[in-house]
Design a protein with these regions (language model features):
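P-loop NTP-binding core
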Residues: 1-217
Length: 217
């Protein structure tokens, strides 16, 4: 979805220059910048695209990594093949990884120094996110047992899709008990803007609410 919102034409058809391909091909810094890093609709923000097909790579990443990257730790690939090559070209590098328990997520743990976890207050989503957070130490141990190093300096939870409702306030209070000082004070509100701006491939900052079809909120 980040690819679609930031540069929607990169989400149409087959995209070969994705993060997953860059990880496996271990291209040079120059090739990364020339072929994989793409400018977006937002000035000063670049993106390496992702695609649906990357999920198939994730499902068999260990096999592919052993074939294309013999001798390299499969959980260090993102850090060594992409982040280390680009870290001096950008002030911030954001890794947008879903909570799927696969090699891509574990690569994200190794490559990141700060981990942000959005927590929706809806009961089922809230419960599953807390379960995910509960499993983090186990996932970190699994990654380090494989020979990788977790260098995370901080892990923050924050509320997302929150409205002025009593059950949402209760969820926020519970998350504060779980995270303590490691909870961001700022929350993302439940807003039609987040759902509708994508229809025009805009953002909540670039699209005027009065142009949301069928909704004025």
């Amino acid at each position: 979805s980040a690819t679609m919102f930031m540069k929607h034409d990169l989400s149409i058809g087959v995209v070969d220059e994705t993060v997953a391909q860059a990880m496996l091909q271990n291209v040079s810094r120059e090739e990364l910048l020339d072929e994989f890093v793409k400018p977006t609709n937002v000035s000063g923000v670049d993106i390496i695209p992702a695609s649906i097909e990357d999920a198939f790579i994730a499902s068999q990443f260990e096999k592919l990594a052993n074939e294309h990257l013999p001798g390299q730790n499969i959980y260090d690939v993102l850090q060594e093949n992409i982040i280390n090559k680009l870290k001096y070209d950008y002030d911030f590098i954001f890794i947008d990884s879903g909570p799927h328990l696969d090699a891509f997520l574990l690569n994200s743990f190794v490559a990141a120094d700060t981990f942000l976890i959005p927590v929706p207050p809806a009961q089922v989503d809230f419960h599953s996110t807390l379960k995910f957070m509960q499993r983090l130490p186990e996932l970190f141990d699994m990654t380090e047992t494989a020979g990788s190093e977790i260098k995370l300096s901080s892990i923050f939870g924050y509320m997302a899709k929150i409205a002025r409702k009593s059950d949402h306030a209760d969820a926020q209070s519970l998350l504060r008990e779980v995270c303590g000082a490691d909870m961001l004070d700022t929350s993302l509100p439940l807003s039609t803007a987040f759902e509708r701006c994508g229809e025009s491939f805009g953002t909540v900052f670039s699209t005027n609410p009065k142009f949301y079809p069928g909704d004025r909120d």
